[in-house]
Amino acid sequence: KDGRIWVSEGVNYRRHYDRKPEGDRIMVLEDTDGDGQADKEWAFVQEPFLRCPMGVAVIDNKVVVSMTPDMIVYTDVNRDLVFDPEVDKREVLLSGFNGRVHDHSLHSVTVGPDGQWYWNAGNCGAVFTDRSARTFRIGSSYMTQEAAGKASDDGHVYVGGFTARMNPDGSWVN
């Protein structure tokens, strides 16, 4: 609708973890003249700790970045489409996803018709606590076994990849 696409850059992927010491970027590409080609681009954010983010979702003035072990929410307070740590906010919404710079781990978020955020993670496993203080233990036959066979606070035992939904504030994951 606005001619923009947001892209997560993954130059620092696995073997190349330190290829770009200044960190990877979340880029904005814009088609300003409606010809279907991006003619303007800029970095929304680039930080040294950004290493191969696997997903980016733009929800109003929030930019949700999926990068293990965290789901990070950048709030563009002044809506200028550039993250400024002096003005804007950065918050780790959820943390505990396994698989550093790994494509089998945490991926992008999307908003459902019910207003909840839907997201998925691959088979690397996870142990995370949502904002309603419930801990989820996702076992993995692929990586670490720390959560294997252990029930989550909702009573279920999870193994492998999973899909979840939650309130936008990170509460009530299910």
What is each stretch, according to the model?
Residues 1-174:
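Beta-propeller domains with acidic blade repeats across secreted/periplasmic ectodomains
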